[in-house]
């Protein structure tokens, strides 16, 4: 199957999953091609109206040479000379997973689909076609440049050959689709990991014969935090067939009773990551970005921005890592308690059997 892109509304986590995990192709819709073409025409009219105005990387050089204006002929020469993107720096033996490279390519198209990349339709089609070709290897380490130019240079080095015109080469390597893709990769997997963790901790509650009262329905009504409510409901789902009989008469250890609170914190981190990923994926992050024509600005406008920096992605990923580390700590405490509880057999072995239970694990520590 093929994901059809008509506008930025089509840049969803589900479509990203189809492209990156299932390996589907991308098709630029006829309507989107027309919109991109109209935008390109209006940008060129804007550029030709005053070739001395500042448009980063178009009427000026890039990087440290941004203050140097160049003549119209030099502007055309600069565009032609950058038709082939040179690979960025990097070192080490590890590479970004191929699914994430596909995510980067998909996310890159968000700037193009409605014309904000100020490029011709052929440029968007070239990028989309990369998903049907051998993928570049993107080094995991050594990307120490400003913004995301270095990793994007690695990816865009694999673009099909073709000349670039004014304003197009910078659109290939500026913006922040890499951080967006990395965050989306976390967002696509985090909820599944949380669901598995919830199931495992519910099993631990039953294995320890802990009371079910800390997970009662009445607590769902009292909880003010919506994420804790959801965590509690998800945990309770696994106790639908659990019996209240045969459980310890006193309260369970702390690491069992705080499960709703800790799982609720993970729920919140996952929800934030999903929301932030969805926003990042469908955002325009080019630099310079082309503002489409309006009644007050009939030719549109090119503006230098900080679109190459996604300030939300790293904190969202860090929070996910921190919350899952909390679950690892809880799992460690549960494991210790399950092997030291007076009401459970040593090494969790069947007293009537001749097995070792988990005794062999002690040799692996």
Identify the function of each model-found stretch:
Residues 1-51:
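N- or domain-start disorder-to-order transition segments that initiate the globular core
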Residues 54-114, 137-182, 313:
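FAD-binding core of FAD-dependent oxidoreductases
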Residues 113, 151-160, 180-201, 260, ...:
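Alpha-helical support elements that line or immediately flank enzyme active sites
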Residues 115-140:
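FAD-binding glycine-rich core of flavoenzymes that anchor FAD
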Residues 150-234:
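Mobile "lid/hinge" segments at catalytic clefts and subdomain interfaces of large enzymes
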Residues 181, 217-221, 301-305, 345-356:
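Short beta-alpha connecting loops at secondary-structure transitions
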Residues 205-329:
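Accessory "access/gating" subregions that flank catalytic or transport cores
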Residues 310-365:
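C-terminal catalytic subdomain
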């Amino acid at each position: 199957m093929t994901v059809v892109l008509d506008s930025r509304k089509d840049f969803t986590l589900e479509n990203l999953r189809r492209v990156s995990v299932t390996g589907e192709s991308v098709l630029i819709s006829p309507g989107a091609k027309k919109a991109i073409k109209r935008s390109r025409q209006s940008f060129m009219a804007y550029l030709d109206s005053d070739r001395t105005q500042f448009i980063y990387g178009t009427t000026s050089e890039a990087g440290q040479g941004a203050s140097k204006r160049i003549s119209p002929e030099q502007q055309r020469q600069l565009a032609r000379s950058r038709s082939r993107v040179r690979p960025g720096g990097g070192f080490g033996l590890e590479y970004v997973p191929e699914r994430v490279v596909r995510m980067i390519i998909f996310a890159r198209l968000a700037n193009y689909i409605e014309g904000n990349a100020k490029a011709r339709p052929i440029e968007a089609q070239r990028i989309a076609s990369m998903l049907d070709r051998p993928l570049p290897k993107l080094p995991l380490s050594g990307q120490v440049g400003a913004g995301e130019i270095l990793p994007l240079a690695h990816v865009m080095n694999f673009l099909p050959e073709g000349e670039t015109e004014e304003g197009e080469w910078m659109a290939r390597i500026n913006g922040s689709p890499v951080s967006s893709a990395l965050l989306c990769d976390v967002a696509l997997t985090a909820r599944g990991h949380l669901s598995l963790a919830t199931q495992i901790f519910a099993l631990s509650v039953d294995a320890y014969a802990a009371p079910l009262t800390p997970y009662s329905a009445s607590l769902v009504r009292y909880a003010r935090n919506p994420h804790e409510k959801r965590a509690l409901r998800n945990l309770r789902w696994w106790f639908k067939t659990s019996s209240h009989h045969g459980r310890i008469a006193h309260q369970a250890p702390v690491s069992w009773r705080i499960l709703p609170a800790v799982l609720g914190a993970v729920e919140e981190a996952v929800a934030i990551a999903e929301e932030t990923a969805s926003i990042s994926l469908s955002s325009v992050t080019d630099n310079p970005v082309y503002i489409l024509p309006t009644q007050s600005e009939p030719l549109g406008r090119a503006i230098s921005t900080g679109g190459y920096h996604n300030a939300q992605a790293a904190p969202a990923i860090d929070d996910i890592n921190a919350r899952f580390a909390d679950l690892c700590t809880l799992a460690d405490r549960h494991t210790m308690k399950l092997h030291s509880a007076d009401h459970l057999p040593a090494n969790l072995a069947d007293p009537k059997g001749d097995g070792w239970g988990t005794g062999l694990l002690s040799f692996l520590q």
